[in-house]
């Protein structure tokens, strides 16, 4: 029994629930008493009377059993409640001597250093922006900072001692003009504990929302605190930065950046906060999302992902760009997304770029559509690790009468590798309803040994009047050995997008990247295929991309094959696209000193 744990508050709530169940059953039994125990015979004959008497007897027997069960239930609830009270009394009796003992332990350090040895810090009073009371030197969590009065910054959260979590920062006060900043989160315990969250920024009624408070840093072990959200206003306030994770932490990442504040009536949403760094060995925190834009306001940019640990760790993902919504005439522009964080020095992958914000169209006829935000750039890899992928471009919406469409955002470029690792893939271009879709992002450069990243596909043009996005170029394998990245495919649209060129191979060894295929054209020509990449000294040239087909116009031209250098075959040319007149096939690439020329593509 020495290992039995009881929570008196939970037991009391359970006893109350049991009593309510008994009351509900008692009310139901009382309601059924008359209809089930006093049945009238269906007729004046003996059989009907016997049947009614039989069922009434069953009802009376049920009521007798129910009365016995109700009595047992009441006794059980009474015993259960008494047990909960006994546990609570025992806990209170045991706690009283411990409180006295704790006072004895804390008194010397309180007198000498002004801080207790064990205990949580006191919270700051609301509406004062107060800093918090001191917590225990050995063990205890920092107190929460007090919220600010109108126009006053929130109080900082308290720092923990050796063991404990930092306190949350107080909320910034609202202002008639600009909102006040939120308080910073307190630092985590020196040995173990997470940083406190930053406080949210205050509302800026006619100006800019308050800045979100930065998250607190951890000590040796623990997660970084989350950055506070930016306050809403004409321009949204920026989100606070995430706190750094513990110096020797491996599992927990840096704190995420705070979300940018909302913007209204033509302003700009707040930028998301930067993710916290990853100490020595952990991952960086994600960047905060950009703030939402309302009534013609642009969405805020996403925050940059935090860098990975100094030695090892992946970069944090970039924050998503904020959505921009239109007013009666002008569509809102989506915010650009944040770049991915860089990896650590030795091992780790670069962070993925965030997604661009969506641009929503104007609600009135004749208005313009909203422009999507640009995708974020992927973070750079470590000495041993790949670059991060680029983010997807934001969606471009149309207006209410479908006349003026918004432009899709371009995909972000892939991050570069350093020593050994592949470049990150380029992000996909954003789609558009009636405007130009976004182009795909360029693939990242490979390391000294590593392949180039693939180019991102062009965005799709959804309706008539749209233009498909061009595919992104494949990344080069810029070092000694590695294949070039494949080019991204062109996007579908009334007018199609061209495919991206393949990346070039490394100096000594590797094949060139294949060119991307051209997109499908609905009313215009099919997109042209991308050119194949050049091979290294030993390797084949990349094949050209196929030309895109067209429903009513000419097929796209096939891309030419890439050339070989010393030993290897030239790449084959891409086939021409199908259409009212077929597209011309691409030329084959030139062979090296040893090898065959590439075949031309079919027309």
Curated annotation (Swiss-Prot):
Residues 1-93 form the PE domain. It comes from the Bacteria. The keyword Signal does not apply. It holds the Pfam family PGRS. SUPFAM superfamilies: PE/PPE dimer-like. Keywords: Repeat. Residues 309-333 are annotated as: Disordered. Belongs to the mycobacterial PE family. PGRS subfamily. This is Uncharacterized PE-PGRS family protein PE_PGRS24. The gene is PE_PGRS24.
């Amino acid at each position: 029994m020495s290992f039995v744990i009881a929570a008196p508050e939970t037991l009391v709530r359970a006893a109350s629930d049991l009593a309510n169940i008994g009351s509900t059953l008692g009310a139901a039994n009382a309601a059924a008493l008359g209809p089930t125990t006093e049945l009238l015979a269906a007729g004046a004959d003996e059989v009907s009377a016997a049947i009614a008497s039989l069922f009434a007897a069953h009802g009376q027997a049920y009521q007798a059993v129910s009365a016995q069960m109700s009595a047992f239930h009441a006794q059980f609830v009474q015993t259960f409640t008494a047990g909960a009270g006994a546990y609570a009394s025992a806990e209170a009796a045991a706690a009283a001597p411990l409180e006295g003992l704790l006072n004895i332990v804390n008194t010397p350090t309180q007198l000498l250093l002004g801080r207790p040895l064990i205990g949580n810090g006191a919270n700051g009073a609301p509406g004062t922006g107060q800093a918090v009371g001191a917590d225990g030197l050995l063990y205890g969590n920092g107190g929460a900072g007090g919220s600010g009065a109108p126009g006053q910054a929130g109080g900082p959260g308290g720092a923990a001692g050796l063991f404990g979590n930092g306190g949350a920062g107080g909320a910034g006060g609202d202002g008639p003009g600009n909102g006040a900043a939120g308080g910073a989160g307190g630092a985590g315990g020196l040995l173990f504990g997470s940083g406190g969250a930053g406080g949210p920024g205050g509302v800026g009624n006619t100006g800019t929302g308050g800045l979100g408070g930065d998250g607190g840093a951890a000590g040796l072990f623990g997660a970084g605190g989350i950055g506070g959200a930016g306050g809403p206003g004409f321009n949204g306030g920026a989100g606070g930065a995430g706190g750094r994770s513990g110096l020797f932490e491996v599992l927990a990442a840096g704190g995420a950046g705070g979300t940018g504040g909302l913007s209204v009536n033509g302003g700009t949403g707040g930028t998301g906060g930067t993710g916290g760094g990853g100490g020595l060995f952990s991952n960086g925190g994600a960047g905060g999302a950009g703030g939402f834009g309302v009534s013609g306001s642009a969405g805020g940019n996403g925050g940059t992902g935090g860098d990975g640990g100094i030695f090892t760790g992946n970069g944090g993902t970039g924050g998503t760009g904020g959505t921009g919504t239109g007013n009666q005439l002008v569509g809102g522009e989506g915010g650009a997304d944040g770049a991915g964080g860089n990896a650590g020095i030795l091992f780790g992958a670069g962070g993925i770029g965030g997604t661009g914000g969506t641009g929503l169209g104007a609600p009135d006829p004749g208005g313009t559509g909203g422009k999507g935000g640009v995708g974020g750039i992927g973070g750079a890899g470590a000495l041993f690790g790949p670059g991060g992928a680029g983010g997807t471009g934001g969606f471009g919406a149309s207006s209410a009468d479908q006349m003026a469409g918004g432009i899709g955002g371009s995909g972000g470029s892939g991050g570069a590798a350093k020593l050994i690792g592949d470049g990150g893939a380029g992000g996909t271009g954003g789609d558009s309803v009636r405007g130009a879709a976004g182009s795909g992002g360029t693939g990242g450069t490979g390391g000294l040994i590593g392949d180039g990243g693939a180019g991102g596909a062009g965005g799709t043009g959804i309706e008539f009047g749209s233009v498909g996005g061009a595919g992104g170029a494949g990344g080069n394998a810029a070092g000694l050995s590695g294949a070039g990245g494949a080019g991204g495919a062109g996007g579908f649209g009334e007018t199609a997008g061209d495919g991206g060129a393949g990346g070039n191979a490394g100096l000594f060894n590797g094949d060139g990247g294949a060119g991307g295929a051209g997109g499908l054209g609905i009313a215009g020509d099919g997109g042209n295929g991308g050119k194949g990449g050049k091979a290294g000294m030993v390797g084949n040239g990349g094949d050209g991309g196929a030309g895109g087909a067209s429903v009513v116009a000419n097929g796209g031209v096939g891309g030419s094959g890439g050339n070989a250098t010393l030993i290897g075959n030239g790449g084959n040319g891409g086939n021409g696209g199908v259409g009212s007149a077929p597209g011309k096939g691409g030329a084959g690439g030139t062979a090296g000193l040893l090898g065959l020329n590439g075949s031309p593509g079919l027309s």
